[in-house]
Design a protein with these regions (language model features):
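Active-site proximal beta-strand in glycosyltransferases
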Residues: 4, 85-108, 113-115, 125, ...
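Nucleotide-activated donor-binding/catalytic signature segment of Leloir-type glycosyltransferases, i.e.
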Residues: 222-224, 231-264
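N-terminal subdomain of nucleotide-sugar transferases
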Residues: 1-45, 201, 208-211, 391-403
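Conserved acidic donor-binding segment of nucleotide-sugar-dependent glycosyltransferases
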Residues: 312-313, 317-324, 333-338
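Membrane-proximal helix-turn-helix segments that form the acceptor-binding/catalytic region
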Residues: 111-131, 139, 155-161
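Conserved donor-binding/catalytic core segment of Leloir-type glycosyltransferases
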Residues: 5-8, 171-198, 202-210, 218-222, ...
Length: 403
């Protein structure tokens, strides 16, 4: 079996991983179960049971890459990895289209974020050997970029017209099925708030729901890594709830990963509201998988990836406009009609059975059994410079204030 090096950009030791951290934890578990020797690098050297762990650093990249058969990287940490690691077959996980997500932070952080995101993505596309993404829409998006960089080239196309040796679908997954507990509450979960969501609309939706179901509540959760994830929309939601004096809106800590099922099971239903954009066309919502895992029916704004799952498994209701009353009517209907509620929970259980991590990560498992360099990657692609972003003035000021 292979010696696998996982390069995770998010802390794991606090036990409260968000989407990227969760994905790396589950990748580690699946590859460990396959018999591989797994080493996880992260900012805090957080441990995953059965795997070795170390800190992210220039020295650890160099030392551990020499002793590895394959590496898996994601996001901006790829810059330092490709700069300091020794050559090793490298899987680049593109499930999170960060270059599109982070465009929401333009007003707050300026052009620097996009410039660095662009440099990171282009460098990763040129230097990676195999790529993972979460949906067919993402796959076409990244293939377009690969044509532009020269990674999708005539030699590769002639050998593999479907390009499955270059990029494959490996969406999020869920853990083993859980028995569903009886549910009688009217508590509604939104979850974490990122700047591409519309939490104020969600608050207005539940305010309208309360006209029919007076004990309905709405819960948001605070991000475990606020220093690396701007929280402008969360602040907006807090201010709006305070202004309206809504005591049914709650803001709670992020649930520990090992305890999140018990936390989610307190809720009757999940709600997601967001404006339609390229980000919604490309993203696959991590929380959708967890909510379905715990049997929560979902009412959500329309996004292609989410729509397809909820429709296929009859596990929720998709609202194709921004109307507060349409979201609210859907929630009231689900909570009041037990047959509809139970049918959606049954659909969620079917989803869980078909989206176990060992199935969704099958392309990665296959690559790790026989790692390889992509021999055509240097023949047509231009090599952009690799730059590790220096701390901005704002970043330095934040660190000084926290010290």
């Amino acid at each position: 079996m292979s010696r696998v090096l996982l390069v995770c950009p998010e802390p794991l030791g606090h036990g409260h991983p968000a989407g990227v951290g969760v994905r790396f934890v589950e990748i580690a578990r699946v590859l460990l179960n396959d018999g591989h020797d797994v080493l996880v690098l992260s900012p805090d050297a957080g441990k995953v049971d059965g795997c070795r762990a170390d800190h992210l650093s220039h020295e650890s990249f160099a030392a551990h890459s020499v002793a590895s058969d394959v590496a898996v990287v994601q996001g901006h940490v790829a810059n330092a990895f490709f700069l300091h690691a020794k050559p090793v077959p490298t899987v680049v996980d593109l499930y999170d289209p960060f270059i599109i997500e982070n465009m929401n932070y333009w007003a707050e952080r300026g052009a620097e974020v996009f410039q660095y995101d662009h440099l990171t993505l282009m460098g990763s596309l040129v230097r990676g050997d195999f790529f993972l993404c979460a949906s067919e829409a993402q796959r076409l998006f990244y293939l377009g970029l690969m044509v532009a960089t020269g990674r999708l080239n005539p030699m590769l196309f002639e050998r593999d017209p479907r390009l499955e040796s270059l990029i494959r679908l490996a969406p999020f997954g869920v853990q083993a099925p859980r028995p569903l507990k009886p549910q009688s509450s009217h508590d509604i979960l939104f979850g974490g708030v990122y700047d591409w969501y519309d939490p104020v609309r969600a608050i207005d939706v539940v305010a309208r729901v309360r006209e029919s179901i007076p004990d309905a509540t709405l819960t948001f959760t605070r991000h475990p890594n606020p220093d690396i994830t701007p929280q402008g929309k969360l602040a907006e939601a807090i201010g709006y709830a305070q202004k309206k004096r809504y005591d049914f809106v709650r803001f709670e800590p992020w649930a520990a990963y090992a305890e999140r099922a018990e936390y989610f099971e307190k809720f009757a239903l999940a709600l997601l509201t967001f404006p339609r954009s390229l980000e919604t066309d490309l993203s696959m919502r991590t929380r959708i998988y967890d909510y379905l895992w715990c049997g929560l029916p979902i009412v959500t704004s329309s996004a292609p990836g989410t729509d397809e799952l909820l429709v296929r498994y009859h596990a929720g209701t998709v609202i194709h406009d921004d109307a507060v009353e349409h979201h609210a009517d859907a929630i009231v209907s689900i909570l009041r009609e037990r047959a509809t509620f139970d049918a959606m929970r049954t659909g969620a259980q079917q989803f869980v059975r078909e989206h176990q991590w060992d199935r969704t990560l099958a392309p990665l498992r296959e690559f790790c059994r026989a790692p390889r360099f992509e021999k055509t990657k240097e023949l047509f692609a231009s090599q952009p410079a690799i730059t590790e972003r220096p701390p901005s003035i704002l970043d330095r000021l934040r660190r000084r204030l926290r010290a």
